[in-house]
């Protein structure tokens, strides 16, 4: 049973509050896919989190594309498409296809699949499909594909929830069960990465209370941080810098502009107003107090050691290095 009772902070008729409706939909975490198709005038590719399996026999999958997408006509005309599931080190690939570049495929490595659809190099998995059916669903077209070829690599998926990229980690309750099992075998020390994950869970939950009290969403908080002390940035630059979904960034920027916390500058760039800077400074002050409280019982020498260990970890060779 959950220890915390949750009450809705927004709700109602989705037609009168489409942004709130989209935020509610965004609470469901998904993976991140790039859907591709061949074309006479060049391949098409879009990011999509609407991917789902439909059937094992026959092997069917589906995804959907908005009618206003610039690639909609290409996918309507193509008899094939491929769904590429991104790994957790492919945020950059996702951002390329979510952005407005005219020649996205020149910015990533790819090869041609069995059906002629592009397959993204180093993707965690792919499903190469022939289009089985198309159905209209509101402002989207639902594409059903029959999988004729697939592939899977070892690794972890890139995740997406509430406008933010993420990674998959074991739940703390699962970690507790694993720790208990470790004790049975005399393995008393917690794995280093497990400790980092638990510290992140605690910090994020504690700071979420302050964000909510200030009326700021997680995406909004990151936008304030990204603009604070920075030259004016575009929505695309903010999304890349803070690892956020561009659409969520645009929505939050519009709300901040309406509230007077952000101002629109030349060339589609945005900057914090004095009100926005004050709001960010209040958050910094709270985080500083929170840090002091959490670390009060830890000696300066131990903090120094922990800091150096984490800095060395962050500066390490990274995934896939030999």
UniProtKB/Swiss-Prot annotation:
The keyword Nucleotide-binding does not apply. It is an enzyme of class 1 (oxidoreductase). It comes from the Bacteria. Its EC number is 1.5.1.42. InterPro entries: Flavin_Rdtase-like_dom, NADH-dep_flavin_reductase, Split_barrel_FMN-bd, WH-like_DNA-bd_sf, WH_DNA-bd_sf. It catalyses: FMNH2 + NAD(+) = FMN + NADH + 2 H(+). Residues 1-20 are annotated as: Disordered. GO terms for molecular function: FMN binding; FMN reductase (NADH) activity; riboflavin reductase (NADPH) activity. Belongs to the non-flavoprotein flavin reductase family. This is FMN reductase (NADH) NtaB. It comes from Aminobacter aminovorans (Chelatobacter heintzii).
């Amino acid at each position: 049973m959950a220890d915390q009772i949750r009450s809705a902070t927004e709700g109602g008729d989705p037609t009168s509050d489409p942004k709130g409706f989209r935020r509610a939909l965004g609470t469901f975490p998904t993976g991140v896919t790039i859907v591709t198709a061949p074309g006479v005038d060049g391949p098409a590719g879009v990011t999509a989190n609407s991917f789902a399996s439909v059937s094992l026999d026959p092997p069917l999958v589906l995804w959907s594309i908005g009618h206003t997408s610039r690639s909609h006509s290409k996918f309507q005309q193509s008899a094939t498409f491929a769904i590429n599931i991104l790994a957790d080190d492919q945020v950059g690939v996702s951002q390329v296809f979510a952005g407005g570049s005219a020649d996205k495929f020149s910015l990533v490595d790819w090869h041609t699949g069995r059906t002629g659809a592009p397959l993204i190099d180093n993707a965690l998995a792919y499903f190469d499909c022939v289009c089985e059916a198309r159905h209209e669903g509101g402002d989207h077209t639902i594409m059903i594909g029959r999988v004729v070829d697939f592939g899977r690599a070892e690794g972890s998926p890139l995740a997406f929830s509430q406008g933010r990229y993420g990674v998959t980690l074991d739940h703390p309750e699962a970690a507790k069960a694993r720790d208990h099992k470790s004790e049975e075998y005399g393995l008393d020390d917690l794995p280093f990465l497990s400790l980092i994950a638990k510290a992140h869970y605690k910090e994020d939950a504690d700071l979420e209370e302050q964000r909510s009290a200030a009326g700021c969403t997680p995406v909004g908080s990151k936008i304030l941080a990204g603009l604070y002390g920075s030259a004016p940035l575009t929505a695309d630059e903010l999304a890349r810098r803070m690892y956020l979904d561009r659409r969520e960034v645009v929505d939050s920027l519009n709300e901040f502009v309406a509230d007077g916390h952000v101002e629109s500058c030349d060339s589609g760039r945005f900057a914090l107003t004095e009100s926005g800077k004050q709001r960010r400074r209040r958050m910094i002050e709270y985080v500083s107090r929170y840090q002091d409280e959490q670390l009060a019982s830890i000696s300066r020498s131990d903090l120094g050691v922990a800091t150096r260990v984490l800095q060395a970890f962050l500066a390490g060779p990274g995934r896939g290095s030999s």
